[in-house]
Amino acid sequence: MKFKFGVDSFIWAEDFKEKDLWIIEKAKEIGFEVVDFAIANPYTFPTEQVKAELARVGMDCVCTTTLTLETNPISPDEEIRKAAVAAMKKCVDICNTLGSPILGGVNY
């Protein structure tokens, strides 16, 4: 296995949006091989645009996310637990689309 050196998008953008696509090329320019996308909101993350930019620039990625009070999988509120499962499924879909081999982060 080849070790790759990466950078987290969170150092530039707390909630990655389409306007932040420049980060991918910037990461490549300064010597990184991988971008770790901190997915703050899987419903607004620009998946297709990120996929295209990664391909254009020639970068790999991994993904992370952080669950919130509204997406807490151990909440006593059933609707919040359902929202947690839906958000995690959406994050997994994003990972699959982008080719990320992992989904890390604060997922508990």
What feature does the model see in each segment?
Residues 1-100:
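N-terminal pre-domain/capping segments
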Residues 106-108:
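Active-site-proximal loop/short-helix segments
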